[in-house]
Amino acid sequence: MSDFFHSDVLSVSELNAFAKSILENHLAGLWIAGEVSNLTRAASGHYYFSLKDSRAQVRCAMFKGAAARLAKPLKEGDHIEVAGKISIYETRGEFQITVNEVRLKGLGQLYEAYERLKAQLQAEGAFAAERKKPLPARPQCIGIVTSLAAAALRDVVTTLKRRAPEIPVIVYPTPVQGTGSELQIAQAIKTASQRAECDVLIVCRGGGSIEDLWAFNEEPVVRAIEACTVPVVSGVGHETDFTLADFVADVRAPTPTGAAELVSPNRQESLHRLAQAQGRLKTVLEQRYFDASQKLDWLARQIRHPRQKLDEQRASIGKLAQTLSYSMKQNLRAHTARFERQTQALQHYRPDVSVCKNNIVRLQTALPAAFSQLLTHRRQSLTAQAALLEAVSPQHILERGFSVVKDTRGQVIRNADVLKQGQKLHITFADGETDVRVSKEQGQQDLFDCI
């Protein structure tokens, strides 16, 4: 008999399971293109439809989780490309695709072009961190490249007005989607770069489908951002949207509003830093004044009797006073210049800065006067102490008619009983000195005095 009658017999369920295994193991990773027909959306959120072309069709099921990722709902007649698990529904033996991903027909070629351009730019170093330009801390002007009708423009302008209303904004209008929009976006970026009116440039638009954002993946836009001499912040779409413009820009912001926050200084933070600078200036000036006062007190306590030491101390105090005055003036000028620079940077808040400026002027006026008064007082005190020392000095006593008598060894003679006849003496007067000899002997003669 034929082998046909002796071959293994499969049940229907075994056949379907075998076919399912073959399909799932050998047809993975395929994209299938076709037109949506017989579309049904269940209350559960699942999609059931057929994908057809001119000669055949296949049943498809797309469950709620995958359907939630669609940029927009499916509709009858859509030309799409799907990827998923190709299998057999064993219960009914029906061939079907369980869809995991959907894209509009033709996006496959776009993604291929996207990956090619991305790889090329990567190889050229367009994404390298070292070519990124830093953002200015306090821009004098901010540029925006977007559509005048875009909600993103309103969001950016509102944020800039709230955070830094004193900074002017220039808009370089351009369509941000549609045929030819990539060329117009690129031209707007080139215009901003050539005019050099702004310190930083925001390139932005609101969220949308991948097709809506595709202009920012086109090479003209990417090359324009790469060549721009002004730092560029990209704020395209939502936080989960990534375009080639994001990779080549100097900074990527998650949203247009985020881009506005990145480029604008915070007004409250600036005012806080100004208040801190004023406090530090006051503390430094007070500390220098106290240090100078203590040093003058210490110098006054170091004054000793010799006239030469007094003269040296006078000269030292004068020099220290000049140095201290010069140092304080220099520091005051430096802090004043810094304060004026910060005042100019915050001209929008001139009333508050004016109060601070008046305080600085008051301190500039009061401090030299106080220092001069203190220095005058110290000089008067020094003069009085010098006069007191002068009054009790030996020279002054001699001028009153006294004299100093010393023996040949330089010992002062305080008692006449120690004198001996013929002893040599040295007498110092106010206006001179002389040597004498004792003519009348008293007591034992000293051998040393007879030489």
Curated annotation (Swiss-Prot):
Subcellular localization:
Cytoplasm
Matching entries from NCBIfam families are given as: xseA (TIGR00237)
In the record, the note on similarity to other proteins reads: Belongs to the XseA family.
Any one Gene Ontology cellular component term annotated for this protein: cytoplasm
What catalytic activity does the UniProt entry give for this protein?
Exonucleolytic cleavage in either 5'- to 3'- or 3'- to 5'-direction to yield nucleoside 5'-phosphates
PANTHER family in UniProt: EXODEOXYRIBONUCLEASE 7 LARGE SUBUNIT
Q: Subunit notes for this chain?
A: Heterooligomer composed of large and small subunits.
Specify the enzyme's EC class, one word.
hydrolase
Name-wise, this protein is Exodeoxyribonuclease 7 large subunit
Give the UniProt keywords, A-Z.
Cytoplasm, Exonuclease, Hydrolase, Nuclease
Q: What is its EC number?
A: 3.1.11.6
Q: Name one Pfam family in it.
A: tRNA_anti_2
Q: Does the keyword Nuclease apply?
A: yes
| Reported function | Bidirectionally degrades single-stranded DNA into large acid-insoluble oligonucleotides, which are then degraded further into small acid-soluble oligonucleotides.
Could you tell me one molecular function GO term of this UniProt entry? Answer: exodeoxyribonuclease VII activity
Q: Which GO terms describe its biological process?
A: DNA catabolic process
* Broad class of the protein's primary localization: cytoplasm
Q: Which organism is it from?
A: Neisseria meningitidis serogroup C / serotype 2a (strain ATCC 700532 / DSM 15464 / FAM18)
